[in-house]
Amino acid sequence: MKHILLTNDDGYDSVGLKALIDALSPIAKITVVAPANNKSACGHSLTLDKPLRLISIKDDFYKIDDGSPTDCIFLSLGNLFKEGFKPDLVISGINIGANMGEDITYSGTASAAMEAVIHKIPAIAISQVCQNRCQDIQNGWEFELAKDTIVKLATRILNNSFPLDERKFLNVNIPPIKPNECKGMKITKAGFREYGTDSDRHINPRGEEYYWIGLHPLIWKASEDQSCDFEAIKENYVSISPIKLDMTSYDDLKNLENWLNN
């Protein structure tokens, strides 16, 4: 039986992770290693300044005490899988909230997939786009479309092959709709966000300032060809983006060389 390693960045008790386990358990052996706490927007961070504990919750289900999603993949491969054996597929999610455009660089969900493909394991990051600061998700969202989508993708990969070369992964975003409202899956490029530096400033009872980041609405740039991830979501498509780890700007290598030498 094929073997899938699951993780996330919302924590081991997230409803999105539970939905992922429910969806994939019938088609593969599942091992879960997830952060003990919410690690949203932690990026591709690896914990180097303190020891980590791999804590067994039940059979094939572990949490890492204060670890990141990247820690989860790294420690899993070195300690839970016998030498010479790797999972057939790593899936990170189901994230509560979108991971589109440059958000991928902040995302713990996407970073777990990055870590997997560094170790030459096919990987998918899957995120559920939500509304109203994700209160719809927290209040009993069924993840029906997300579960349908991930089963289709995982089955195709496990029965055939991964469609991307090494050091590339699939970034999947699910619109906040029912399966019968979905127009299908669309292959997309990562879009662009209009980033600001807004934060919410407050004063605590001791008169000290504190700030919350990430409470303001997301604003996206429209693309001319309507082929980016957030536009697919807006049109009720599942967005599937191929993402590569090589961030070299090859178009600029020659120009940069000329700039440096002249």
UniProtKB/Swiss-Prot annotation:
Main location (coarse class): cytoplasm
Cystine bridges: none
Keyword Hydrolase: yes
Localization per record: Cytoplasm
Gene3D superfamilies: Survival protein SurE-like phosphatase/nucleotidase
Note on how the cofactor is bound: Binds 1 divalent metal cation per subunit.
Family: Belongs to the SurE nucleotidase family.
Catalytic activity: a ribonucleoside 5'-phosphate + H2O = a ribonucleoside + phosphate
Record's protein name: 5'-nucleotidase SurE
UniProt-listed Pfam families: SurE (PF01975)
Binding site for a divalent metal cation: 9-10, 40, 95
InterPro entries, sorted: SurE, SurE-like_Pase/nucleotidase, SurE-like_sf
Cofactor(s) annotated in UniProt: a divalent metal cation
Role noted for this protein: Nucleotidase that shows phosphatase activity on nucleoside 5'-monophosphates.
EC number annotated for this UniProt entry: 3.1.3.5
Keyword list, A-Z: Cytoplasm, Hydrolase, Metal-binding, Nucleotide-binding
Gene Ontology CC entries for this record: cytoplasm
GO molecular function: 3'-nucleotidase activity; 5'-nucleotidase activity; exopolyphosphatase activity; metal ion binding; nucleotide binding
Taxonomic source organism: Aliarcobacter butzleri (strain RM4018)
